[in-house]
Structures are given as structure tokens and as C-alpha cells.
Amino acid sequence: MFENLNTALTPKLQASRSFPHLSKPVAPGSAPLGSGEPGGPGLWVGSSQHLKNLGKAMGAKVNDFLRRKEPSSLGSVGVTEINKTAGAQLASGTDAAPEAWLEDERSVLQETFPRLDPPPPITRKRTPRALKTTQDMLISSQPVLSSLEYGTEPSPGQAQDSAPTAQPDVPADASQPEATMEREERGKVLPNGEVSLSVPDLIHKDSQDESKLKMTECRRASSPSLIERNGFKLSLSPISLAESWEDGSPPPQARTSSLDNEGPHPDLLSFE
């Protein structure tokens, strides 16, 4: 019975002897158990451990063999090219091997990916684009009025000239505040003839309105005395006109723009 067991284990032992450095020795406790009890579990435990060790050794050997196999037999897919000169220099033990290998790699990369030439140096400085005048570009800080606006709206000088001719009976001191208000509303006249419109002050708007109301009240207080002195009447209805004609008084003249503009909010920009 022992002879049969020994003959059965001989091929496995021979296989294990072929890899003495890879296989592990069988546990020493398994031999006396196997010899003492041939049919006991100790023999099977030792044989299974031996098979496990053999499988590990064979797997490691196969993996090592596949890893060391020549790359030419595996094909060109997924295989890196081996630099033979670098391998020879590494085998000889020279220190210049890494530098030569890097130079070879750089040459290969330059061949596969050609390096582009650098852009030419900029010799001429880029000049800005020539802009038009501010009047054409409409970006001037002082807006320029067109000829149509000049034609429709008279200048402040013309308005001042027309005011005394339209109302010759009104003295000059009464027309001065109106001219100053017109100047403020219309804007300042520049030396080149352009009119710069004044920007309305929205913050101090209430104070400006109060000052305008005071000016109009002053003119109202002064205007009735002038009208009564000159014989004018405020109401120009047909009845009043007939009565004034019967009394022999001269017919009332046409009301000027200054009288029409008198009100809670005088519009000094409209000239009739």
C-alpha cells in the first residue's frame, strides 16, 4: 500500500524537483501523519498543499516566460520599439547611455511631429486707424446744431431785437429779466457761432422752479400797472372790444409773446 502511494507521488515529486527554487517544501508534520495513518486526512492535506505550490510555481514561470518573450513574435500592435544602441550601452555600463537614448527619442519625435517655424518678428508698429472729425463721429461733448435748427429757431440776439419792436411801450427794464431767462433757457453762445445747450439740473430742480415762479410773480405785479397806464384790458372778448371802440379809445394791440408766455410755467422756447 505504501509502495502504491510512493509510485503515485513520484511524477509530482519529479515535477517539483525541476523547480527547486520556486517550489516550497512540504510541511514536516504531514509526513508522519501520512505514514502513521495512510487513509487519514493528513495525506490529502499535504498533497493539496503540494499541488497549490506547484500551480503557483508553474503560473509564475509561465508569466515570466511570456514577459521575457521576444516582441517580434507578438506583432507590431501595442509594442514599443526597442533602441538597440541604448541597450548595448546599458549593458556595457557607460554613463552616456541615458543622454544618447534621450537624443534618439527627441530625433524620433521631431521626425514624426515636424516643428513649426516661429512667426517672423514684427518690425512695423501698428498704427491706429485714422478717425474722422468729432462732428462727423457725433461724439463731441458740445452738440452741434444743424442748419435746419438754426433756420427754424432764431438766435437769442434776434429774439432780443424782436422783443423791443413788438412792444415799444414796455420799458427796457421789464424786458431785461426776460432776456436773461431766455439766455439761460436757450444756452450759451460760443465764439464760433455754435450754441451749447445747457444741461437741466435735476437735483436742484425745485429751487429753479421756485425762482422762476418768483420771476413770473414779479412780472405779473409790474404788468397790470403798465397795462392800466397804457389803457389795455386783459379781456379781449367781443363785448369788451365793442365797448372800447365806442368809448373812443384806440383798439388794443396784438398781445406779444411775452404776455402770452406769462403763466405758472412759461415756455420761453416758443416764439410766434
UniProtKB/Swiss-Prot annotation:
Q: Where is the composition biased (Basic and acidic residues)?
A: 202-220
Q: Which InterPro entries match?
A: DUF4628
What positions are modified (Phosphoserine)?
222-223, 249, 258
Q: Which UniProt keywords apply?
A: Phosphoprotein
Quote the biased-composition stretches of kind Polar residues, using this chain's numbering: 1-17, 155-165
Region Disordered, residue ranges: 1-47, 111-130, 147-272
User: Which Pfam family, just one, is annotated for this protein?
Assistant: DUF4628
How is this protein named in the record?
Answer: Uncharacterized protein C1orf226
Q: Which organism is it from?
A: Homo sapiens (Human)
GN (gene name): C1orf226
